[in-house]
Amino acid sequence: MHTEKREMFYKEIEDFWHDLYGTEYALYDVHTESSHIIDSIKEAANQIGELFFKTAPLLRSLDDQTLFSLGFPKDTLPYLRLKTMDTESVISRLDFAVTTDQIKLLELNADTPTFIKELFYVNELVCRHFQVQNPNKLEEKKLALALKHAIFEAYNELDRTNYPNVVFSSHDTHEEDKLTTLYLMKLADVDATYVPLSQLRIVPSSTVEEGEHIEAGVYDQYGQKIDVLYRQTYPLEHLIEDEDPSTHEKVGHMLLTLAQQKQVAIINPPSAFLLQSKAVQALIWALHEQHHPFFTKEEHHIIETYFLPTYLEEDPFIERKQAFVKKPSFGREGDTVEIYNKDGIKIDEDQHKTYQEYTAVYQQFIPLPTATMKTQTQTIEAHIMYGCFLLNGKASAVGIRAGNQITDNESYYLPIGLK
């Protein structure tokens, strides 16, 4: 019965992936939370967002060797100091462990956060269906404004006078990425087209083809030069490695060079990638432990309250006999994450090892709280992790992913309502 109700409800939602990889993803259930907890998460998110954005100019002032030691791939170093917009990141997401007495930051996804359509759009429909209030009720309008503003700000930085050619792009073979990108394009409500990444054409320098002069730039499938390229779901660390399959040209490098030359504007901007490395948290924690004057007394208090001790080595935890998590400085969906007990013995790990080549960071382990919820087949108890989006650094929609202690790509989307 539950399965049929779920199917009937979710199949009415257009362009939504309630099942992923052939398994249940969106739960037909709602977790109710007090407005006090939601407000506390948002307050934490606002303060943490400010701290990260304050740290970005400091990162841009570091030399290449230091940035390399913070896990940034060597190929990205020439582009890390690019500042193309006022904001460091248009859409980012903070992940939290939330218990009754504390809120602790696990990580920031500043570059390509997903979970957008679920929280800004689907959550409202679920709340209406279950007749509870939606904590994210006003957030979709804010997202629409943030998108529109970002597109025109990015375009204005190019100093052009033509009507902007705005393109939203993703891998069209990945359902979640494509549908998220199409949702954002519709919400932005600007004259834009969707072009799969595979159909973009990059012209690294001005050339002549069949007697026609072609400017350096990124072109859509109709041969029109793109002004603003929105790449919400395509991580920069993947982009930088991209090669043309036939010519083996480094198209990722070319694209970022064109952004550097103001031939195209990219959103999220390259500055978002600068905050993506989890080693940035280790840097913030190191400055905090040194009582460094870079942060004010109030900011040190915020770090003490919400951040977990994070280092580029495991020794502090071994010495203090504390459990810790080892995770790659760049990584998604719990991939390559390992948990160690206070004796330094591995007790849990994600089976995927995609990001092993990246610098590791070590963070104090904090158990995720659990909650009960209904799946298609049974009522289960699962670990829950809260996400809170930042729009231009300001707290926005809140939501829950449920699953294992290591939140991976098999976790559920658990809708959230107000008590």
What are the residue ranges of the model-derived segments?
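Preference for protein termini
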Residues: M1-K419
